[in-house]
Amino acid sequence: MCGQCLPLLLPKGKTMAHVAPASYSIPQKALHWLMALLILFNLIFSDAMEEVAEAYERGEVPSPDDLTFANIHAYVGIAVLCLGLVRLVIRFTRGAPPAPAEEPPVLAVAAKLAHGTFYALFFLIPLSGIGAYYFGNETAGFVHGGPLKSLMWLLIAVHILALLVHQFYWKTPVATRMTRG
């Protein structure tokens, strides 16, 4: 986002200094953990969606159980999409804590890139899933269950690894910003 556009998104009379809190707000923390649970649920329990797609490809009717679980997967994905939008609005209006002073600048840039990619995936994964499930778009289905899903798993692993490095190597209290801080 351009530096000239950002002031337009800030509350009236606020500057970036006012928007950079020391910790995430309770709504931000709640959204983070709720979305983490929903995303992990959908990443782990996607088999029924694949069964439904394969049944349709074979010209068969999917089992009622597979349809039920595929619908749950779809509804959870739509919830992630909606919560991602709320989370983005809160992030623009409230801001986020600054990177710890001890963090090397190159890793601070990498963290911003990773967080930006997370936000993109909060929208791209559900939208591609909607395209595949509700509109039968095979390309959307491939992108949804292939590269985007793999990228989400990779980002989750990097996110956890970065947290562990902050906590145990640099001894920075980054985890408390999203838990109790």
Predicted features along the sequence, with ranges:
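Membrane-embedded alpha-helical bundles that constitute the cytochrome b-like, heme-associated redox core
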Residues: 2-181
